[in-house]
Amino acid sequence: MFIDLTPEQRQLQAEIRQYFSNLISPDERTEMEKDRHGPAYRAVIRRMGRDGRLGVGWPKEFGGLGFGPIEQQIFVNEAHRADVPLPAVTLQTVGPTLQAHGSELQKKKFLPAILAGEAHFAIGYTEPEAGTDLASLRTTAVRDGDHYIVNGQKVFTTGAHDADYIWLACRTDPNAAKHKGISILIVDTKDPGYSWTPIILADGAHHTNATYYNDVRVPVDMLVGKENDGWRLITTQLNNERVMLGPAGRFASIYDRVHAWASVPGGNGVTPIDHDDVKRALGEIRAIWRINELLNWQVASAGEDINMADAAATKVFGTERVQRAGRLAEEIVGKYGNPAEPDTAELLRWLDAQTKRNLVITFGGGVNEVMREMIAASGLKVPRVPR
């Protein structure tokens, strides 16, 4: 069976590709290389909101365009292909989870603001002492009248330095089994008890943070779903996040740039793509890109019924293979390019930044070692590793 996009989906893809091709100014792109969540990022997302582009995969009843999950993947892939940042956590995980489990007040307050590019969320799950074992989290939320009082610390909270809200996992019942006593609260980052410190990663950019909650007051109506039923929301949100971490557009971006560079003779008169090893490397990158695209379509099309093992497998494949694609690209550009030539130097700089940035996603949404355990236990029914 040959699986491909319909003519209508191809048309949508072309429209989105054209839209993204001139969305970002050079100054905005330069600023976002150092801070992916600052003023330039905000301006770009608001622009997409004004243009009605953020709701491609959202149902019309929530203000979206009413397309399906494949069209949403097209949107995400084309954004990554053009190196355009998206409010991915907000748009693709928090938004859909609120649509399914949020109160009417929460839907009315947050969903239109998300589609307008005005509301930005960060995910507060990981803790210094718990790591990927989310069920061992210690951040507490104690009921006090019509508020919860939150105390604790999170780490690797991406975008928290610029977020309007934190989607926070808290322990609301210390006596319950560790998976049972967790709730999800929406924390307003304007609360005086909220603070953060930056964590600068390998690419030199400010993506993520440690976040602190010191007697933060959260209104009871900012509890998502039922109290102590947060684990179900966490797994729903994380399954969606894992699919979005390995979009095929990451591969397409590498392929497009390196293929274009390799097709032009260098200063020495040699055209890199004439060499067999360059053709092999580009062929492998293109093949990985296509496989990842098909995996994303398959898993995304499951919608709310997304399988945990499938989401984890997609995440592992995409995040690890994009590392290989980056290494293959750097090898051929380093071998056949001259760093003294501006185009080659810029491509090498870009590839280095991409490789370092893509390293981060191997542990976003759960480290890949844990993902493999989930694939084995949930997908292959292999007994879990004793701890």
Swiss-Prot record:
Gene3D superfamilies with a match to the protein in the record: Acyl-CoA dehydrogenase/oxidase, N-terminal domain (1.10.540.10), Butyryl-CoA Dehydrogenase, subunit A, domain 2 (2.40.110.10), Butyryl-CoA Dehydrogenase, subunit A, domain 3 (1.20.140.10)
Entry's Gene Ontology molecular function annotations: FAD binding; oxidoreductase activity, acting on the CH-CH group of donors
Cofactors required: FAD
A Pfam family: Acyl-CoA_dh_N
Cofactor binding note: Binds 1 FAD per heterodimer.
Enzyme class: oxidoreductase
Keyword field: Cholesterol metabolism, FAD, Flavoprotein, Lipid degradation, Lipid metabolism, NAD, NADP, Oxidoreductase, Steroid metabolism, Sterol metabolism, Virulence
Reactions accelerated catalytically: 3-oxochol-4-en-22-oyl-CoA + A = 3-oxochola-4,17-dien-22-oyl-CoA + AH2
Alphabetical list of InterPro entries matching this protein: Acyl-CoA_Oxase/DH_mid-dom, Acyl-CoA_Oxase/DH_mid-dom_sf, AcylCo_DH-like_C, AcylCo_DH/oxidase_C, AcylCoA_DH/ox_N, AcylCoA_DH/ox_N_sf, AcylCoA_DH/oxidase_NM_dom_sf, Mycobact_Acyl-CoA_DH
The protein's Enzyme Commission number: 1.3.99.-
Disulfide bonds, paired cysteine numbers: none
Positions that bind FAD: I123, G124, Y125, T126, T132, T158, V367, N368, E369
Name under which the protein is recorded: Acyl-CoA dehydrogenase FadE29
Protein source organism: Mycobacterium tuberculosis (strain ATCC 25618 / H37Rv)
Biological classification of the source: Bacteria, Bacillati, Actinomycetota, Actinomycetes, Mycobacteriales
